[in-house]
Amino acid sequence: GGGLGIPYFPGDVPVDLPKVGAALAERVANLPSQLAETELCMELGRYLVGEAGVYLTRVIDRKVSHGVTFLVTDGGLHHQLAASGNFGTVVRRNYPSAIATRFGAEASEEVNIVGCLCTPLDRLADNAMMPRAEVGDLVAVFCAGAY
C-alpha cells in the first residue's frame, strides 16, 4: 500500500500520528461483530525510513545549453526513480537536494541536475539554486530512504 507519507517538500507537514491513531481506534471499536477477529496491518516503510536515506551521485559533466546550466551526474532515474518524478507523480517537484561537497557555500546559480540516460525524464532537480558545482562534486538527494 501507499503507507504513511513524509514531508518531502516545503509546506508539507508530518503525519499527525495521534490523530491517525484516534481515528483508527474509533473505527476498529465500531467494527461489526463478524469482523471482531480481523487483524489490521499498516505498511509503514516510507514513514519509518524515508527521511533516513541520502542518495549520492557524482557530477560527471557541466554544460550550458541556451543559457541553461546542466549538471550531468553518473546516477539518475535508474537509481532513484522517485526523486526523478517518474514514480506515479502527477506534478514533478524537486526532492530536497544539495551539492554535498559544497555544503558551506552560498547558492549562487540556477541549475538543472540530470542523470546520464538519454531521456528527458532523467532529471533530479529542475531550476534549483545551488552553489557552483564542478565535475567531481557530489550531489545529495535527501528523503531517499524509501525506494
PLM-predicted stretches and their roles:
Residues 1-42:
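Acidic, glycine-rich loop-and-beta core segments that form the ion-binding/anion-interacting portion
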Residues 37-147:
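Charged (often Lys/Glu-rich) extended helix/loop segments that serve as interaction or gating elements
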